[in-house]
Curated annotation (Swiss-Prot):
<comment type="similarity">
    <text>Belongs to the aspartate/ornithine carbamoyltransferase superfamily. ATCase family.</text>
</comment>
<feature type="binding site">
    <location>
        <position position="224"/>
    </location>
    <ligand>
        <name>L-aspartate</name>
    </ligand>
</feature>
<dbReference type="Pfam" id="PF00185">
    <property type="entry name" value="OTCace"/>
</dbReference>
<feature type="binding site">
    <location>
        <position position="265"/>
    </location>
    <ligand>
        <name>carbamoyl phosphate</name>
    </ligand>
</feature>
<feature type="binding site">
    <location>
        <position position="109"/>
    </location>
    <ligand>
        <name>carbamoyl phosphate</name>
    </ligand>
</feature>
<dbReference type="InterPro" id="IPR002082">
    <property type="entry name" value="Asp_carbamoyltransf"/>
</dbReference>
<dbReference type="InterPro" id="IPR006132">
    <property type="entry name" value="Asp/Orn_carbamoyltranf_P-bd"/>
</dbReference>
<dbReference type="InterPro" id="IPR036901">
    <property type="entry name" value="Asp/Orn_carbamoylTrfase_sf"/>
</dbReference>
<protein>
    <recommendedName>
        <fullName>Aspartate carbamoyltransferase catalytic subunit</fullName>
        <ecNumber>2.1.3.2</ecNumber>
    </recommendedName>
</protein>
<keyword id="KW-0808">Transferase</keyword>
<keyword id="KW-0665">Pyrimidine biosynthesis</keyword>
<feature type="binding site">
    <location>
        <position position="139"/>
    </location>
    <ligand>
        <name>carbamoyl phosphate</name>
    </ligand>
</feature>
<dbReference type="GO" id="GO:0006520">
    <property type="term" value="P:amino acid metabolic process"/>
</dbReference>
<dbReference type="InterPro" id="IPR006130">
    <property type="entry name" value="Asp/Orn_carbamoylTrfase"/>
</dbReference>
<dbReference type="GO" id="GO:0006207">
    <property type="term" value="P:'de novo' pyrimidine nucleobase biosynthetic process"/>
</dbReference>
<dbReference type="GO" id="GO:0044205">
    <property type="term" value="P:'de novo' UMP biosynthetic process"/>
</dbReference>
<dbReference type="GO" id="GO:0016597">
    <property type="term" value="F:amino acid binding"/>
</dbReference>
């Protein structure tokens, strides 16, 4: 990975740890340029991309598709339910097939953690891999759009007090964000049910009760309660979770005037956040969705830069 002619060039994008700080900031800046309409878009019709989603998705899937179409790529139709996956074909063989057909980029979401390792290590698969989310592992494109949203607001990361709240153990968003925000100099706090907290997170921030820190926060990043990963073993109701850990009207009133609220969505209204606050003045949830298109344009461009450099 490198920066060529002031533009990021990537072979794959599978995790935030694999990016240098220069590459992270370069992608954020490029996303901002796309958003401002400052980029003259080249003709990429000859470049083929396949979005291989094996978990349900609205924002990530459609955001990538919009980004790809804005860049002029040819987007191959893929429906996992109508593919050979239903005949028992493995992810590896699906990607191997797409690569053999001449696909340049595969954007993949899959329930298995680290699914991408055998793909990027394969000597036969020539398609570049973009991780659209792997199980409870990583979600690099969501992390980058979150960073753009924060940077638009504050113009910096250094010294910001940021709390990541909720279903921490099961959240790929949390894992990607805590790693890079720590590296960029933010002061991180975590809160949520203790059974959803891992001591491994202590390397990045401090576990604390929300009511002890809420008045000092610059960013409150709420996480979706991932019911599908709990096997029905939650120890509390939606109402009790909201009162203990959610953003209630009372907690909202305690936030600084300059503070912002974020959530990767989909939102469980009246669980992580009061229904009336999803579009409140401090909320940036809709901005995150919009920024996703521009950051993903920057990601796809960076992959194409990397492929052109290596060809």
């Amino acid at each position: 990975m490198s920066v060529v002619n002031n533009r990021v060039a990537l072979t794959n994008l599978v995790s935030m740890e694999a990016l240098t700080t220069e590459e992270v900031l370069g992608l954020i800046n490029r996303g901002s340029e796309y958003k401002a309409g400052k980029v003259v878009i080249s003709d990429h019709q000859k470049d083929l991309v396949a979005n291989l989603f094996f978990e349900n998705s609205t924002r990530t899937h459609k955001s990538f598709e919009v980004a790809e179409k804005k860049l002029g790529l040819t987007v191959l139709d893929f429906n996992a339910d109508a593919s050979a996956v239903n005949k028992g074909e493995s992810l590896y063989d699906t990607v191997l097939t797409m690569s053999a057909l001449g696909t340049d980029i595969c954007v993949i979401r899959h329930p298995e953690d680290d699914y991408y390792k055998e793909l990027v290590e394969s000597p036969t698969i020539t398609a570049s891999i973009v991780n659209g989310g792997d199980g409870s592992g990583q979600h690099p494109s969501q992390c980058l759009l979150d960073l753009l949203t924060i940077y638009e607001e504050f113009g910096r990361f250094e010294g910001l007090k940021i709390a990541i709240a909720g279903d921490l153990t099961h959240s790929r968003v949390a894992k990607s964000n805590m790693q890079i925000l720590k590296r960029l100099g933010a002061e991180l706090y975590f809160y949520g049910p203790e059974e959803w907290y891992s001591e491994a997170f202590n390397a990045y921030g401090t576990y604390i009760a929300i009511d002890q820190i809420i008045k000092e926060l610059d960013v409150l990043m709420l996480l979706r309660v991932q019911h599908e990963r709990h096997d029905g073993h939650q120890s509390f109701s939606k109402e009790s979770y909201h009162q203990a850990f959610g953003l209630t009207q009372e907690r909202y009133q305690q936030l600084k005037d300059s503070a912002i609220i974020m959530h990767p969505a989909p939102v469980n209204r009246d669980v992580e956040i009061a229904d009336s606050l999803v579009e409140a003045p401090k909320a940036r949830i809709v901005s995150q969705m919009a920024n996703g298109v521009f950051v993903r344009m920057a990601i796809i461009e960076a992959i194409l830069n990397g492929r052109n450099k290596n060809s």
